[in-house]
Every structure is written in C-alpha cells, then in structure tokens.
Amino acid sequence: MLEIKKLNVKYGQIHALHDVNLTVASGHIVSVVGANGAGKTTLMMTLAGLLTPSSGEVLYEGTALPKEAYKVLGRGICLVPERRRLYANLTVKENLLMGAYLRIDKACIQSDMERMYTLFPIMEQRLKQYAGTLSGGEQQMVAIARGLMSRPRLLLLDEPSLGLAPIMVENMFKAIREINCQGMTILLAEQNAFQALEMSDDAFVMETGRIIVSGTGKALLNDPVVKKAYLGI
C-alpha cells in the first residue's frame, strides 16, 4: 500500500530524516518506534503532505504521493497528529464533522458518527461539550474519531498514548486494534515501544532520523538491542 524509498527531509541545515526506507502492507499495523526527537513526527508530517522531502520517493497504492496536504487526504491518508490538535472552542460533534469536510457522501456522515459512538461509547455523552474541556484520553478518542470521519484507507497515528494515564493508554491501544480489525491499515509512531511492538505486524526502530532495525513486531520484541534500548529489559 505504502512504499517509502530513500526519503530525506531537512529543516534548513538540519537533516531530519536520512534515507528512510519503509513499507506498509494493506491491512497491517506498522509501528515506527523511537525516542523523542528520533524523527517519527517528521516522517508522519511528510507523509501527510505537511512537510516537503528534499529527496526520495513515496508511493501510495502504486503512484507518487501528492505534495499538498488536502490532496493526500483526498487520496485516503489521514494524520491524527501528536498532542491531538483539536479545535478547543468547538464541541465534540463539531470536531467530528470537521473530519468529514472533504466528503461528498453527506448522507453517510450520520451513520459514521454513530459508528464512532460504538467505538468510543463515552463520546456520545460528550457531543455538546467543548473539546478543550475534555480529559486527555477523551481528547485522543475524539482526535482518532475525527480522523476516521474522513474515511481514510491509511490512518497515521502520531504518539496516540502521549500524556495519557496508564488505563487510558490500555484503552487507546485496544481501540487501535479494533479499528485495524475492521479493515483499517495503520501506521503508528510511538514512544511506548512495548505496546506498539506487541500489536504490530511489522515495525521499524528509528534513531536520529535513520531506520536502524526493522522486522515483525514479535521479532523486535525479542531483539536484544531493542529490548535493552527501548524496553528496559
């Protein structure tokens, strides 16, 4: 579904991504794990069309990925950004509807809203509440649901567990598994290496903008280098 070849991204003189090669198969959960500052968010923003690569190639379903963010979204790729980035002064319902703003199948939007309530039951109770007043875990639920409202085929999740209480982290990863079981392909950038690797079909470890290890999630969970550096084992 997604193939990244020798991707390089720079911020001025800072070389943020170095010859990144990565593939995402349709229907899989693929994780990119690494410490803060490893380049995970830069990768996700580049795939979403928010940053322009200096070189390299990104193919999505066999063709080059557009450079404009709205065209990337139109192709079926949606980024749920780090720290959620909700519209704090809009209600939960209004935030969800913002996720569907490019859709032309307006008649299906309400049924998709109801699907979000099934996935995140507490959301229906919060529809009229301003997003800025929600807890961190509730905000993350809304952010993911807003992304799903665009009906993507590839969902990019950037640090979905960041800043959440342990019980909310568990609930969040459970929801991600359920979304994947419904057919969604997911690329996940995450510092919580254990949870991410445990649920992933394939995974990549990133350090200072480079992919240093790759393999199945299960294989990386048992890799001595990964266990020592990222799992504290």
Language-model features and meaning:
Residues 33-35:
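The feature captures the beta-strand-to-loop junction immediately N-terminal to the Walker
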Residues 147-148:
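ABC ATPase C-loop
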